[in-house]
Curated annotation (Swiss-Prot):
PROSITE patterns: EPSP_SYNTHASE_1 (PS00104), EPSP_SYNTHASE_2 (PS00885). InterPro entries: Enolpyruvate_Tfrase_dom, Enolpyruvate_Tfrase_sf, EPSP_synthase, EPSP_synthase_CS, RNA3'P_cycl/enolpyr_Trfase_a/b. The active site is at D313 (proton acceptor). It catalyses: 3-phosphoshikimate + phosphoenolpyruvate = 5-O-(1-carboxyvinyl)-3-phosphoshikimate + phosphate. Pathway: Metabolic intermediate biosynthesis; chorismate biosynthesis; chorismate from D-erythrose 4-phosphate and phosphoenolpyruvate: step 6/7. Coiled coil: none annotated. GO terms for cellular component: cytoplasm. Its EC number is 2.5.1.19. This is 3-phosphoshikimate 1-carboxyvinyltransferase. Phosphoenolpyruvate binds at K22, G96, R124, Q171, R344, R386, K411. It comes from Photorhabdus laumondii subsp. laumondii (strain DSM 15139 / CIP 105565 / TT01).
Length: 428
């Protein structure tokens, strides 16, 4: 296995231009495929998850043209349902942002499609989405373990009244919302339990609006969707920078700035993970917002106790930032860490202990007390891009850190370590 040793970083300063958002990129690709007319997507993320979506769309007969650097994509929309004549198997890696929406999309009309992926994908639950789609008439079979991929999707979803559990992943609701306007009948989606990661639903609704479809909802509990609608291309769509990826550079500035300015997101961003900057501010960092940037300056950091259900990905960065804050930090209401690329609660607790932190791992929370001095460690990344990027922050101490399998950042930010190095200064 490859490894990367990061030597202690004494100072962080500069500007980072963010790659496109994974969440926005894959939603936009699917809506562009559904839409009437061609759509030119710019600042598309070039990463493993996006490649899986692009490969799947190509296999399903959607034509598109990519720029040489893969950040601009012109998609020829089909103006309706995505159907495929004859059986086909689509391999989606560990891309939840491809698996969940495509499951719903391919339930429209008639299909004969198998959706599969890496071993970890087969451990990530999808039963709540399948249950909801079946309520609307879809025919879906589990090919291995009940409630988990791989799936055999045959179509049949016509809409109607559907109940979906909101407690595990907002991607289930996103998948239903994007597919429902194309169903034969009107749909009424009822949320059971507390809806996690609500800002990600706002991303979905904003994107759908850009493609001509508006959805009404009652306090995120019941969503009303007219059937037999058509998505219409906006012509051009600019993909925002990835707010989750911004978190590492903003946290680095809070710990060892200098000042870091992140461009590609701003005060009017679609993404809930921009709220991460507000959390850093509560901890003591200095934050400044512009229309298309956010800037962080070093401050004296103190621990916090917060519900971070709305920013689960960026909350991971708070867990490693806590190593540099006075007192304990508690991150609450994050059960859905357990069903991400790995069981992130267990992984985070395990690796934080390696660097000397005192950690209490609860079912849906983590309590972190930093050590007087961080210990050198080899950090396991669990094939999880965010684990690798979060633990790079350990190098902001006077202790080196070794990141195992650093290439796993290719899922969302292939160039991450080069960009971190560009902003870093070390004692000569």
């Amino acid at each position: 296995m490859q490894s990367l040793m990061l030597q202690p970083i004494s100072y962080i300063n500069g500007t980072i231009n963010l790659p496109g958002s994974k969440s926005v990129s894959n939603r936009a690709l699917l809506l562009a495929a559904f839409a009437k007319g061609a759509t030119c997507l710019t600042n598309l993320l070039d990463s493993d998850d996006i490649r899986h979506m692009l490969n799947a769309l190509a296999a399903l007969g959607i034509s598109y043209r990519l720029s040489d650097d893969r950040t601009c994509c012109e998609v020829d929309g089909i103006g309706g349902l995505i159907t495929h004549q004859g059986p086909i198997e689509l391999f989606l890696g560990n891309a939840g942002t491809a698996m969940r929406p495509l499951t719903a999309a391919l339930c429209l009309g008639k299909n004969d499609v198998v959706l599969t992926g890496e071993p970890r994908m087969k451990e990530r639950p999808i039963g709540h989405l399948v249950d909801a789609l079946r309520q609307g008439g879809a025919e879906i079979d589990y090919l291995e373990q009940e409630n988990y991929p791989p799936l055999h999707v045959k179509g049949g979803f016509v809409g109607g009244k559907v109940m979906v559990d909101g407690r595990v992943s907002s991607q289930f609701l996103t998948a239903l919302l994007m597919a429902a306007p194309l169903a034969e009948n009107d749909s009424e989606i009822h949320i059971q339990g507390e809806l996690v990661s609500k800002p990600y639903i706002d991303i979905t609704l904003a994107l759908m609006k850009s493609f001509g479809i508006t959805i009404n909802h009652d306090q995120y509990q019941i969503f009303h969707i007219k059937g037999r609608q058509q998505y219409v291309s906006p012509g051009h769509y600019l993909v925002e920078g990835d707010a989750s990826s911004a978190s590492y550079f903003l946290a680095a500035a809070a710990i060892k700035g200098g000042t870091v300015r992140v461009t590609g997101i701003g005060k009017n961003s679609l993404q809930g993970d921009t709220k991460f900057a507000n959390v850093l501010e509560k901890m003591g960092a200095k934050i400044r917002w512009g229309d298309d940037f956010v800037e962080c300056e070093r401050g004296t950091l103190t621990g916090i106790d917060m519900d971070m259900n709305e920013i689960p990905d960026a909350a991971m960065t708070i867990a490693t930032t806590a190593l540099f804050a006075a007192g304990e930090t508690v991150i609450r209401n994050i059960y859905n860490w357990r069903v991400k690329e790995t069981d992130r609660l267990h992984a985070m607790a395990t690796e934080l202990r390696k660097v000397g932190a005192e950690v209490e791992e609860g079912v849906d929370y983590i309590r972190i007390t930093p050590p007087p001095r961080l210990l050198p460690a080899e950090i396991g990344t669990y094939n999880d891009h965010r684990m690798a990027m979060c633990f790079s922050l350990v190098a902001l101490s006077d202790t080196p850190v070794t990141i195992l399998d650093p290439g796993c950042t290719a899922k969302t930010f292939p160039d991450y370590f080069n960009q971190l190095e560009r902003l870093s200064q070390r004692k000569s």
